[in-house]
Swiss-Prot record:
GO terms for cellular component: plasma membrane. It catalyses: a quinone + NADH + 5 H(+)(in) = a quinol + NAD(+) + 4 H(+)(out). NDH-1 shuttles electrons from NADH, via FMN and iron-sulfur (Fe-S) centers, to quinones in the respiratory chain. The immediate electron acceptor for the enzyme in this species is believed to be menaquinone. Couples the redox reaction to proton translocation (for every two electrons transferred, four hydrogen ions are translocated across the cytoplasmic membrane), and thus conserves the redox energy in a proton gradient. This is NADH-quinone oxidoreductase subunit L. The keyword Translocase applies. GO terms for biological process: ATP synthesis coupled electron transport; electron transport coupled proton transport. The chain crosses the membrane at residues 8-28, 34-54, 95-115, 123-143, 188-208, 209-229, 251-271, 284-304, 322-342, 382-402, 412-432, 468-488, 505-525, 613-633. GO terms for molecular function: NADH dehydrogenase (ubiquinone) activity; quinone binding. It is found in: Cell membrane. The keyword Thylakoid does not apply.
Amino acid sequence: MTTSLGTHYTWLLVALPLAGAAILLFGGRRTDAWGHLLGCAAALAAFGVGAMLLADMLGRDGLERAIHQQVFTWIPAGGLQVDFGLQIDQLSMCFVLLISGVGSLIHIYSVGYMAEDPDRRRFFGYLNLFLASMLLLVVADNYVLLYVGWEGVGLASYLLIGFWYHKPSAATAAKKAFVMNRVGDAGLAVGMFLTFSTFGTLSYAGVFAGVPAASRAVLTAIGLLMLLGACAKSAQVPLQAWLGDAMEGPTPVSALIHAATMVTAGVYLIVRSGPLYNLAPTAQLAVVIVGAVTLLFGAIIGCAKDDIKRALAASTISQIGYMVLAAGLGPAGYAFAIMHLLTHGFFKAGLFLGSGAVIHAMHEEQDMRRYGGLRAALPVTFATFGLAYLAIIGVPPFAGFFSKDAIIEAALGAGGIRGSLLGGAALLGAGVTAFYMTRVMLMTFFGEKRWTPGAHPHEAPAVMTWPMILLAVGSVFSGGLLAVGGTLRHWLQPVVGSHEEATHALPTWVATTLALGVVAVGIAVAYRMYGTAPIPRVAPVRVSALTAAARADLYGDAFNEEVFMRPGAQLTNAVVAVDDAGVDGSVNALATLVSQTSNRLRQMQTGFARNYALSMLVGAVLVAAALLVVQLW
């Protein structure tokens, strides 16, 4: 371990936003006037520390760049010793810069977006708590500390999604997100228990060193349990249903959850645990299947959503599916998963903040059927949203082209039927993404004006537009900077490993042409449906079965209700009935017997001496009779 300033100051990454959250949440109304400024300062300070640590890492050789800081011994309990240890390596640094950088821009944007909210100070406190938890998650050097950050992110998301708690829909959405994430958290916790019982430690270094000697069955079980946790946190099938409802929170929350923090946590967990998954092919196959299914699942849902935020939420489910698919490919895909995660952070944050500007301009209206023709009224929002749109659909040379194209090529490179299925799913997802995002673009900024009478859309203030502009710049250039020359792949190689260049199932130019071809088809179909014909202000009732299913989130909630909720409720009622009739019934019967016996005995206590004398005489006769019987026997 190389001694450097990073070994002394890494803890500030977590401490600064955590201190900001503590001051804002416990300081009360005294911080109302300047609380938003403190929240932004804490986020920017964390980004500054991250930039300082990056400069420190760049000054050293690749294999010596990891920064370790043991703050204190946290849990010394027999065979279990857990240190409050922090680790910044090449993988962690990618997340630190994304979380703190994009998170800071979202903080600044929120100054304008939440300007009229009386609880703005509390909102910034929750944002700081979210940032601190996510940073702890990615800089922890062991699974226990990661789990603390994991739970902190879950708590902060619950608070932010339900921030407007006076709205029943927001309170319900917060509870739904919290409960569904508890399912994944339980899976991750059991996976950690199994990890400790197998390796005797929960530190990354100790676990990964022991992986080669472990049973493949145990590694598979651990991998599947960790995948369950990742599915909940990153909204992957079958635990994706909470993400659409999470749009009930303020729009900056959507940007923070979808772009820079929460939904990327599952991808981080899988890539960080790469040495384990590399030796558990069954678990790795499950990761690939989940990613492929989810990227199509989310894309189909996005095609039928009229609420602009819910359409973008569906796109997040799909785009995270691409990342999970890439992570499931092992060393061949880890770097591409992280590349898409980073580029997605820019263009998805830009899309959500742009949608927030549109909603702000349209007086909280979120139905795209009530938009139309907004490009003239919102020129900056239109330009920044448009650049992010080109990035997400994968038009060269925008960011998404490089990262998504790399995943498609890696999927096709898996070879055989597996490669054909995975590559086909990735290509189909790219075409559907182009369709629904073009639909969003056309319904919002083009066509006739479908505004309600009296609406006067206006551009957002500078404090909101400048973060959008910076994110648009990232949407344009980040992909090329990370991909050209294998920059990100070489940067991550000491952590995620490398693989020999496999024989491509298709030449690179063919894979790229196919990807651009399906994107062009998606754009053309969307233009034909939404660019050349009037769009009704009310969604048609008579639609195809697929559209109806997509509007209902492919019946994800109905599936959970029928498969889990109702059987669970019936089981609970049965257990309660057994408890009432059996356990409680036995206790109550015994109490009744004792009560009745005592009542009868009490009636025998008359208070008259002759009754007591008679009782004594009867007792003596019975004793004498018993003795006589014994003697005769």
